[in-house]
Amino acid sequence: MLIAYKYRLYPNKEQQEYFAKCFGCVRFIYNRMLSDKIDYYNETKQKLNNTPAQYKKEFPWLKEVDSLALANAQMNLQTAYNNFFKRPEVGFPKFKSKKNHKYSYTTNNQGGNIYVSDRYIKLPKIGLIRVKKHRDFDGLIKSVTISQNPSGKYFVSVLVNQEDKEKFCQRKAEILILQNRN
């Protein structure tokens, strides 16, 4: 069962600059890929399957941010396309505006590169960031979404894969039994 936990972040100036860079790069890659898909379809009447990696040669500053954030922007665009073709009333994907002051990006947990302690969260390419953790959770972190609201406050939403309580308790008991045998 997937459950999300939202916490307040307290990044320093350097981390705030990195987040601003990530927000901008995610918006840029989404808009650029959408524009290229539209142009390619108008010329050839075929779908274009492009990836963020193809743009890193042309725009080297994209290498400065988390590659999984860019990959998630690609997945969001693909989801918007699929929704449009399945249900046209949803509408064609729209370009992301700079004027929208709700910024966010999502990154995935790969090999434990994201973890949460009592006072900090570790994120890829940026390291430890102070967090106000008011609730604990058990389970495996799937992804995190960093967001900034219009007032400038930062938040992190941690998506956790939690097992059902019965399965979790049973598994925990099995682990304790195995540890006691050793």
Model-derived features with residue positions:
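Nucleic-acid substrate recognition interfaces
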Residues: 1-182
